[in-house]
Amino acid sequence: MARYRVHVNDPLDKEATQLLMNKEELEVTSEHLEKDELMKIIPEVDVLVVRSATKVTADIIEAGKNLKIIARAGIGLDNIDVQKAKEKGIKVLNTPGASAPSVAELAMGLMLACARHIARATVSLKEGKWEKKALKGKELLGKTLGLIGFGNIGQEVAKRALAFGMKIIAYDPAKPETDLPVEYVDLDTLFKESDFISLHVPLTESTRHIINRESIAKMKDGVIIVNTARGGTIDEEALYEEVVSGKVYAAGLDVFEVEPPTDEIRRKLLSLDNVVATPHIGASTAEAQRRVGIELVEKIFKELGI
């Protein structure tokens, strides 16, 4: 007989969903519900599984009188009122390492796309042009990569960048222990010394607009900036201005402060030839989604003791 009700509100890997359904202790429903509908069922739910699409607000948590676990399939918790969950004694689970290789690979892909004008070259060639001189790029070899955040993803990026012959410096107040040849520096030093800067931090009050007009002014002329972390960590209006001015050589963006990026500021930014962009797909690989799903389900089972 089912002891717990699990509601999967955002798509989860099929194998992971099946593992949930195979547990006789669980009654599992899997359907995306908008807030009004979710509020109707949440009083009966013990475990709520979400990705980034569902905003688990304070009122949803308050209504979840049986809620024991909020399980986030992925890394970021900015769509969950974690403080409210803590006040209610609700466990918040996530999978910080499961998607790290996929996000790191995309970060490297964006660096290469920016340095070698890959997106622009593709469009140009498909238009029947042959613009070899206009598409002269930069090597990664010998360049300094500054990583803002050196957790799971930052370390995976470092491993790959080292294989390209890059020097790695990193800013992370926690200074995680590592065997990688990485030098920890303060933020100002990172801005001044980096040829490439890649962000790998959550969105918090201390990281909001960590890249802004003032920080860009400290950077090398021709810096390349990549963001596969969270929208809001870059002041995108300032980034637009500095790409136009040439201070920033190019930017590779997988995340935006407004998603989808349809407002005027984001449209202007995306109109630039030397901005390469993807629609928040850092963890969107079959392998990452399987790891995320399986790891999350195992954590749910452990927390419920089943």
Curated annotation (Swiss-Prot):
Group of enzyme by EC: oxidoreductase
Record bears the keyword Cytoplasm: no
Pfam families linked: 2-Hacid_dh, 2-Hacid_dh_C
Coiled coil stretches, renumbered: none
Gene3D superfamilies assigned to the protein according to its UniProt record, in alphabetical order: NAD(P)-binding Rossmann-like Domain
Residues of the active site: R230, E259, H280
GO biological process: L-serine biosynthetic process
Sites where the protein binds NAD(+): N152, I153, D172, T228, A229, R230, D254, H280, I281, G282, A283
Gene Ontology terms, MF aspect: hydroxypyruvate reductase (NADH) activity; hydroxypyruvate reductase (NADPH) activity; NAD binding; phosphoglycerate dehydrogenase activity
The keyword Oxidoreductase is annotated on this UniProt entry: yes
Keywords linked to the UniProt accession: NAD, Oxidoreductase
E.C. no: 1.1.1.81
InterPro entries the UniProt entry points to: D-2-hydroxyacid_DH (IPR050857), D-isomer_2_OHA_DH_cat_dom (IPR006139), D-isomer_DH_CS (IPR029753), D-isomer_DH_NAD-bd (IPR006140), NAD(P)-bd_dom_sf (IPR036291)
Reactions accelerated catalytically: (R)-glycerate + NAD(+) = 3-hydroxypyruvate + NADH + H(+); (R)-glycerate + NADP(+) = 3-hydroxypyruvate + NADPH + H(+)
Role description: Involved in the degradation of L-serine via 3-hydroxypyruvate. Catalyzes the non-reversible reduction of 3-hydroxypyruvate to yield D-glycerate.
Membership in a protein family: Belongs to the D-isomer specific 2-hydroxyacid dehydrogenase family.
Protein name: Hydroxypyruvate reductase
Species of origin: Thermotoga maritima (strain ATCC 43589 / DSM 3109 / JCM 10099 / NBRC 100826 / MSB8)
